[in-house]
């Protein structure tokens, strides 16, 4: 029996998902605890609630996955800023701040809250995270061939 924790935070609604033996078993949005609509902070309360509910320990957790690759995002924001620096500065500077204070500190949060081994922190491709979410919530497409088309603003630089 192994558990995988999925975490989304720092940009949109923060949330935590728990997968047990490849099946999504639970999901919580941080706003359920903070009562702040669209809360983007690290979902500490949701994470602690689910860890307690399922009695999760380091030995039971196979991985803790973040929904993007922060260093890839960093390089994309940098390239984006260089193309039109004066027009993009306001957007890029706020994204850099979010990235620096958020995504890059993901493993610090999991270590502090879960006492999780560093090698259990994984970073998923952003658009793959969207696609897997679609599969998890639509039982009609389970175990079938499928094409999932993700349209997103920036993601991992794979945007059309």
For the regions a language model picked out, list residue spans one by one.
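Short acidic/glycine-rich loops and adjacent helix/strand connectors
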Residues: 1-160
